[in-house]
């Protein structure tokens, strides 16, 4: 990458570039720099305009190197099988067209709930080189993003769903892949039921969450249960694709990350009947809110949630 700096009264400039397994610090009298950064990932750039070594002004910003790597490198990560023994593929979107297929997806617009900051807009979702690209922007504190669902266009009861995605992980980001009961418009939440296939709350520990929500008819209160998987390197969630899956039947839901099981929850109880009905698919990137907290100076904008495919299978 090439960087040019300028500042009135500066005698020289310095830039420090840091990322996973990478660090480079250079000085320049004319403010021109060149860095050869090959690993994909997120980098922090710190630029200083010096009068003397200890008298300077400083500017920091973040670079998501995924935006400029090759197509081959961009697609790195786990890929799930196209088929499974004993299952039929009943619905899929490979995002291979020039635009989002509106026979599959609805665009939700407006402000969301959970004290989130973003305004959902259709314009923040598009197809880019065979991937769904959901963009979270934060220009001047005016946060925008996108949320898509398949309500009234596709829903299913029981089976397996695989979603291959690359998600943003900086502070305040809340990417989610989830299912909501098709009865939502008639009986509202949580009576309709909710199955969260994947949520990431922009936290530093790399926890990928799976959760279910329902209305407990025995006590009239909301029911919640779930768990999480700690990944070894949270930056890989944004630099590599992973496949987020559940296998769901009338008795239990099993969560998988890259086809490795990490969570099981039983749903056969009488008061959990809404978790055994038809559900539709939702993909979204929220910003801020009750779970991830608000963005800060380390947050990366624009942030991208890329989805390679969504595939739904049911037993023969």
Residue ranges and their predicted role:
Residues 1, 12, 35, 40-49, ...:
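GH16 jelly-roll
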Residues 22-29:
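Short beta-strand segments within Ig-like beta-sandwich modules, predominantly Fibronectin type-III
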Residues 50-56:
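Short, solvent-exposed loop/turn segments at the edges of extracellular beta-sandwich modules
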